[in-house]
Amino acid sequence: MRLASRFGRYNSIRRERPLTDDELMQFVPSVFSGDKHESRSERYTYIPTINIINKLRDEGFQPFFACQSRVRDLGRREYSKHMLRLRREGNINGKEVPEIILLNSHDGSSSYQMIPGIFRFVCTNGLVCGNNFGEIRVPHKGDIVGQVIEGAYEVLGVFDKVTDNMEAMKEIHLNSDEQHLFGRAALMVRYEDENKTPVTPEQIITPRRREDKQNDLWTTWQRVQENMIKGGLSGRSASAKNTRTRAITGIDGDIRINKALWVIAEQFRKWKS
């Protein structure tokens, strides 16, 4: 379920309008990298990510969020991994907005990858759909631009299915025991060993805002996702010391958790249908 890329802490920018090239240059300079990293072979086809973005812009997709991983080796800064979330023009605002997640690097650590996602405005959470909705990978060879554009439309083609599943989850009620089970499953994704989880399932399913107090499957998932990604929950460590859960600040970890939570939610949807 993990992506073929590893992101640590990162620089990021988010706007509720299309990002400009100046903003991208300031926060994700690797998007404009002028050449491949010296470690790449002659077979590696190099195309700056900004060229891909401009082609996607021509097709009606605009970036609203961008981030780039921080690297210790400054020589790799211009080639480091980056992620952009793009929305279809005309579908910018709304409670939940479908997005295309584009990942890439020019140091050989990642191919182009595109994944369907959803942005939830009420809590500014970026959700990532599970593997069953498709994940497009384009290696750095051949007609990269054409394959990425084709992949973008493939991802766009599953948005209706994503929306249908989301609406179905909103209609499924979970009782307190079922919500507890969802929280327990989510904690196992993060900590693996139930004896090492610093917080309880009850904490992870607790809402942070009034509008998230509903007991449907979709809202339960949103509560769990936000609590896990943002952290800050009081708990006890394995050595019985007071602690707080850490926010997930790495992009790779964010996407891994998100995709796993989508799979759990899908399993609950099928179980309750």
State where each predicted segment sits.
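General structural signal for secondary-structure boundaries
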Residues: 16-25, 31-32, 47-51, 55, ...
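Amphipathic, interaction-prone secondary-structure segments
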Residues: 46-112, 262
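Intrinsically disordered, low-complexity regulatory segments
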Residues: 1-47, 54, 58, 265, ...
